């Protein structure tokens, strides 16, 4: 399981050090793809295969299913960590998430998310005020 928030940088070659606590969970190969809210999602291969099966089961006749599947898979790339624990992020993904120098890597249960520091700070500031309301609206979810 992935959890926590870490600050890192993306170098001029588009490489970022993956937090040590996430490396083992991601494994030797993992998938990075466009996520929601202008971040990137990173999945270990076993989790990616589960998502792949669910998305393949969506009806081809549904416009939203086709659109989401295209969005999700067309942005996906298989990644490996180098000996320094860095991942080379595709330029299309860097552009999508507006990852420049400073970034934030968070753990979200079965995946990691890579955020631009600026976008993450805006997102958390916006969500902070509505966190209690969001939790209240989650039907059947008790902590």
From Swiss-Prot:
Q: Keyword set for this entry?
A: Cytoplasm, DNA-binding, Repeat, Transcription, Transcription regulation
Cellular component (GO) terms are: cytoplasm; nucleoid
Q: Which Pfam families match?
A: MraZ
Transcription regulation among keywords? yes
In Swiss-Prot or TrEMBL terms, this protein is called Transcriptional regulator MraZ
| Record-annotated SpoVT-AbrB domain positions | 5-47, 76-119
The entry lists its GO molecular-function terms as: DNA-binding transcription factor activity; transcription cis-regulatory region binding
Source organism of the structure: Bacillus velezensis (strain DSM 23117 / BGSC 10A6 / LMG 26770 / FZB42)
Decide whether keyword Transport is in the record.
Answer: no
Q: Name one GO biological process term.
A: negative regulation of DNA-templated transcription initiation
Predominantly, its location class is cytoplasm
Q: How does it assemble?
A: Forms oligomers.
Into which family does the record put it? Belongs to the MraZ family.
Task: Give the subcellular location.
Answer: Cytoplasm, Nucleoid
Concerning PANTHER family, the annotation shows: TRANSCRIPTIONAL REGULATOR MRAZ
């Amino acid at each position: 399981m992935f959890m926590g928030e870490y600050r890192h940088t993306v170098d001029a070659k588009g490489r970022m050090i993956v937090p040590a606590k996430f490396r083992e969970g991601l494994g030797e190969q993992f998938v990075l793809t466009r996520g929601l809210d202008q971040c990137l999602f990173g999945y270990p291969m076993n989790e990616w295969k589960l998502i792949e099966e669910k998305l393949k089961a969506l009806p081809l006749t549904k416009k939203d299913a086709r659109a989401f599947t295209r969005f999700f898979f067309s942005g996906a790339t298989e990644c490996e960590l180098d000996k320094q624990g860095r991942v080379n992020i595709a330029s299309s993904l860097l552009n999508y998430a507006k990852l420049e120098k400073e970034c934030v890597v968070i753990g979200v249960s079965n995946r990691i998310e890579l955020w631009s520091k600026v976008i993450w700070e805006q997102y958390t500031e916006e969500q902070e005020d509505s966190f209690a309301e969001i939790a209240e609206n989650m039907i059947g979810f008790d902590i």
